[in-house]
């Protein structure tokens, strides 16, 4: 089985994040999806990224966590708080299959199915700080639902954008 997306949902330690970065950079043929730590404000997530020195053209950091329906908890706890990386891997695969790796898995086309609400509602001003600092936000977009709203890698330069790095990787491996 060829693996091109790597995530360890819900594990947000610096050691694991730097391990994923080392792994995907060593392979150079896959993409890492890192979950921001649970329960953090936008400024705390930015501090985490900066302090942990998370940087890679082969990875992204996604924020915030999301609530989804929980069929097992119906009646008692109908929602479950989940890390975003699994959803981002899913929307990435869906857009890869429908449009290609060159299309950013973000925007109103990137609705995260089964989600109900966000752990934290990122506003426009917060998005304007997080996005250029290479933190991909998930937003609730009126009329569409909860959407992936960023597609940046954890680096600036030629490979700032996820689809640029992934398209380059796709061409090299074809």
Mark where each language-model region is:
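A glycine- and small-residue-enriched flexible loop/hinge signal that marks low-structured segments
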Residues: 1-174
